[in-house]
Amino acid sequence: MTVHVSNCAATAEDPVSREIRTESGQREVFCGLTGIVWLHRKIQDAFFLVVGSRTCAHLIQSAAGVMIFAEPRFGTAIMEEKDLAGLTDANIELDRIVTQLLTRRPDIKLLFLVGSCPSEVIKLDLSRAALRLSQRFSPGVRILNYSGSGIETTFTQGEDACLASLVPELPAAQDEKSSLLVVGSLADVVEDQFMRMFDALGIGPVQFFPPRKSTALPSVGPNTKILMAQPFLPDTVRALQERGAKRLAAPFPLGVEGTTGWLRAAADAFGVDPAHFDKVTGPNRARAERALAAYRTELADRRIFFFPDSQLEIPLARFLSRELSMKLVEVGTPYLHREHLAEELKLLPAGVAITEGQDVDLQLDRCRLARPDIVVCGLGLANPLEAEGITTKWSIELVFTPIQGYEQAADLAELFARPLVRRAKLVA
């Protein structure tokens, strides 16, 4: 069974030479603290302690949809005015809070001290605090730090900073046998599906980063092959490559085509016979293709505009244009790593407008002029655009929702069809 690909055929255009507009100006994005929402669910024995303001606390609690009395595995050490004014020693108070937290929550095995805009403004050295507290609480608890500040970042970079801080803690691989390391947070159900697929293909050993438990960190070394599951992890991948790992060039596992290309990259690296690959993946590909057919009818020829927000924009645009026949008006992305996204850029239709960075006023002008059928954007832009009669899809929902793999291809398509159906019902 071959995947449906619309007439926007893959171009031979060099992705490096493809024309990409770069903009710099006012931006509309969440900060990296947002990554805690999915990371605290993924690493089940970790706790994320944000050193920040009440605004930081409200952001995370609202985004996670969890009441604080439910004792989630995240919290905020709130910096008061006296801390910001330098009238107190913030390190003493931080030590007290961490001690209280670890005494109350003995299940915590990994503690992240997460920097924020306020803590960085007053130059609070969380790396030194993490080292000091690690010496005190080791070996029972590992304490690390990273920045979730919103200064010059977008919200998915929080995961990159978190995982990059964890790379030095990974054990060195002792086995000379090749291993596969899937890098990037995936929902447990998606991870299990991919694990079954790798087992059926005879690929292994396979490890996932981040792991579900911090006590089961994957090993890394010169024989480790990296398969990126998320496109927003350049610092993490660089740190792994410095440990000797080698990245496999592949599209990202969104849709049938992307998932097949992603799995094929691993299969080729591990010498899997092409006939065996087709035998293992064929039924899943056929089932996913049938599930996509209904949404293709709804989405074909619909015009879509991407504001830069999540860094998922390029793979999503490829999926929507090639598998669902949508028309790309403009594809904006906060940052574009040309090497990591080279396989995706090759598959975009020739001449598509790609924008790196953001000048939100200019992009709003272009969006209003184009009047697309649907706009993918952040929460801050969605309501104003909806008020103007433009249908929107929240980009952050595409990060929170399991969308990778064959089984989720139709779910991903539905995320774009649903707002259009809702708009049609409201108009009717």
Swiss-Prot record:
Catalyzed reactions: chlorophyllide a + oxidized 2[4Fe-4S]-[ferredoxin] + 2 ADP + 2 phosphate = protochlorophyllide a + reduced 2[4Fe-4S]-[ferredoxin] + 2 ATP + 2 H2O
Needed co-factor(s): [4Fe-4S] cluster
Pathway annotation: Porphyrin-containing compound metabolism; bacteriochlorophyll biosynthesis (light-independent)
The keyword Iron-sulfur appears for this protein: yes
Cofactor remark from the record: Binds 1 [4Fe-4S] cluster per heterodimer. The cluster is bound at the heterodimer interface by residues from both subunits.
Keyword set includes Hydrolase: no
Record-linked Gene3D superfamilies: Nitrogenase molybdenum iron protein domain
Self-association state and partner proteins as the record states: Protochlorophyllide reductase is composed of three subunits; BchL, BchN and BchB. Forms a heterotetramer of two BchB and two BchN subunits.
Annotated protein name in UniProt: Light-independent protochlorophyllide reductase subunit N
Organism for this UniProt entry: Rhodopseudomonas palustris (strain BisB5)
